[in-house]
Amino acid sequence: MHFSKMHGLGNDFVVVDAVTQNVFFPEEVIKKLADRHRGIGFDQLLLVEPPYDPELDFHYRIFNADGSEVAQCGNGARCFARFVTLKGLTNKKDIAVSTAKGRMVLTVKDDGQIRVNMGEPIWEPAKIPFNANKFEKNYILRTDIQTVLCGAVSMGNPHCVIQVEDIKTANVAQLGPLLESHERFPERVNAGFMQVIDRHHIKLRVYERGAGETQACGSGACAAAAVGIMQGLLDSPVQVDLPGGSLIIEWDGEGHPLYMTGDATHIYDGVIKL
């Protein structure tokens, strides 16, 4: 099997062309490939599949290191666009893809940055999914070690975002797993810890479901910016500083799609026997 190793701000991926190759990934195979000592090592495995709809260019699938399939990965989307361009699978600047829960347009800009139309943030609790009677800008979540206020939103995958005073001392290691598996999120959740610097600038750490804390989470950056704007803390555009680098998020409010712009880096190509 031919693959490429890529990263988006340190969030690393193995990307596989399933358009020209016949591949099959049982959960145990994904876990072996994800092992950083005995496999290749990655946060997520990305599959480029033929489109299910003739109006689209590709279908985009994402698997976590634990073998679970998820519907969205923003950093992965940028790497997906870079991959299909580098491999000559398309020569389009605007690439339309489907995911498990919707559609996205990936734009390769002239400066090499990739702008992703992430669609509209979803606030309705049942669609996140999140157990709540109605939408609120802040929800109270009780855990074994701390009660927190959080915003909840879906960017194609579920996110909760809590505001912290200092990102360096945020209790991500302990609170992250408790939020990820909180009973009010039936499909688990990605937990974002956000420090507001000013109305156009935040710092963020994300504990991702199925992956733990990562260097960067694109959909998490989108969720944090959207929650901050919805709560009246931020204005678009928002620079989001993650441990692995920065993203620019643009959102004009309800009824409008959210855009994420950032880099995607090709590291190397390889071949592995499955």
UniProtKB/Swiss-Prot annotation:
Binding site residues for substrate: N11, Q44, N64, G74, N75, N157, N190, E208, R209, G218, S219
Localization in the cell: Cytoplasm
Residues annotated as catalytic: C73 (proton donor), C217 (proton acceptor)
Record site feature (Important for dimerization), residues: Y268
Highest taxon of source: Bacteria
InterPro entries reported in the protein's UniProt record: DAP_epimerase_AS, DAP_epimerase_DapF
SUPFAM superfamilies: Diaminopimelate epimerase-like (SSF54506)
Keyword annotations: Amino-acid biosynthesis, Cytoplasm, Isomerase, Lysine biosynthesis
Pfam families hit by this protein: DAP_epimerase (PF01678)
Keyword Transcription regulation: no
Function: Catalyzes the stereoinversion of LL-2,6-diaminopimelate (L,L-DAP) to meso-diaminopimelate (meso-DAP), a precursor of L-lysine and an essential component of the bacterial peptidoglycan.
SUBUNIT field: Homodimer.
Family: Belongs to the diaminopimelate epimerase family.
Protein name: Diaminopimelate epimerase
